[in-house]
Structure formats: structure tokens, C-alpha cells
Amino acid sequence: MILFQSVGEGYGKRIYEGIRERSSDREVYYIDGDTDPDKRDIFTKRMEEGVNKVMVASFGTMSTGISVKNIHNIFLTESYKSEVLIKQSLGRGMRLYDGKEKVNIIDFVDDFSWEGKDNYLMKHSKERIEIYKKEQFEYKIYEIKI
């Protein structure tokens, strides 16, 4: 599951289209506030029933009341720092069942710090790390230079 926050600028749609273009062997679903509730239910049931599926969804549509046990990886693609939102997002993948022992959370951070000063993306990232520590989640930090 790939979660995004900015629904107004087409950010999630671009992620969805990029994955669909590169993943012809996978079913890829897109859910935002404009997605019909019946369609949302169909997509979440399909996620639950199969493997090798990808859901790109806005935080707002997946934050509460959704239960999909068959989520093994969650990608957080935008910077935010709300502890409630973070816990709700991580909770999407924490529903265990026979054969599932963990969920991988991939938390993307763009470092636009300048002249030794953290920008808000890095500040939010540091706050999320503190939440991960407080909740005793195992985590690793990887720096990828591009």
C-alpha cells in the first residue's frame, strides 16, 4: 500500500500511473476521496484476497475503518508529523494473521536542508523517528544519494 496526502495536485495519480506503466504483472488500484465507496470496497477485498497487488491511496480514505490484513509493505510518500495519522497509517499493515509476522514501513524523506539548516521535511522526519522509537518499532535509516 502506498499512502499519499496531497490529493489536489495529482500526486497520488502520478504515482499510480507510474506503477501501472512499470508493473504489467500486478493489479494496481487507486483510491482517493473521489473514488466511489463501492469501488473502494471492491479494491480492498481484492487486496485482501490476493498477492502481488498494489494500492495507491490517500491518507484520508485509509486512515480509519479499513481492515486489510494482506498488507506487507506500506510506503509513506509525503512528509507529515501527526502522531495520530502516523499510528493510523501504520495500523493499516499491522493486522497479523497466520504466516504474517511483520509489516515493512518505507518512509520516504526528501532532504532539502540548506547550509546546515533542516527544512520542514527533515524536521517532520525527525519527529516521526521519535514516534517510531516511542512505539518501539525497529527501524533503519538508509541515505540514497541521487
Predicted regions and their residues:
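Conserved RecA-like ASCE P-loop NTPase motor core of nucleic-acid helicases/translocases
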Residues: 1-7, 31-32
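Conserved helicase ATPase core of P-loop NTP-dependent helicases/translocases
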Residues: 10-63
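Short, acidic/turn-prone active-site loops that include or flank metal/cofactor-
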Residues: 33-36, 78-83
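Conserved segment of the helicase C-terminal RecA-like domain
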Residues: 92-128
